[in-house]
Amino acid sequence: MNKYELVYILKSNVEEEKRNQLLDKFRGIIEADGTIENVDEWGNRRLAYEINKINEGYYTLVNFSAAADVPKELDRNLKIADEVIRHMIIRLEK
């Protein structure tokens, strides 16, 4: 299993209940064939630049270990979610 780091930014007006639902959805995808090591919610922050006329976003960092196919499925689900402004998944060095 490889180690990965996921950062995703949600629209800042998303309610806490919806944020938790999304985190649970992403957590389910990861835990189907991996383990979550850490979830760090950074909260609302100003974006470095405007994205689709949005200036603020809710940042979340997730560190996890998983099989090689998990990031592809996670990426697909992050792209589909309307509340996600941006996301990035990187593989960490061994």
Swiss-Prot record:
Keyword RNA-binding attributed = yes
Task: List all disulphide bridges recorded for this chain.
Answer: none
Give the top-rank taxon of the lineage listed in the UniProt record for this protein: Bacteria
Q: Which GO terms describe its biological process?
A: translation
- Pfam annotation, one family: Ribosomal_S6
Q: Which Gene3D superfamilies match?
A: 3.30.70.60
Q: Which InterPro entries match?
A: Ribosomal_bS6 (IPR000529), Ribosomal_bS6_CS (IPR020815), Ribosomal_bS6_sf (IPR035980), Ribosomal_S6_plastid/chlpt (IPR020814), Transl_elong_EF1B/ribsomal_bS6 (IPR014717)
Q: Which family does it belong to?
A: Belongs to the bacterial ribosomal protein bS6 family.
Q: What does this protein do?
A: Binds together with bS18 to 16S ribosomal RNA.
Q: Show the NCBIfam families listed in the entry.
A: S6
| UniProt protein name | Small ribosomal subunit protein bS6
Organism of provenance: Alkaliphilus oremlandii (strain OhILAs) (Clostridium oremlandii (strain OhILAs))
* Lineage, top ranks: Bacteria, Bacillati, Bacillota, Clostridia, Peptostreptococcales
Q: Which gene is this protein's source?
A: rpsF
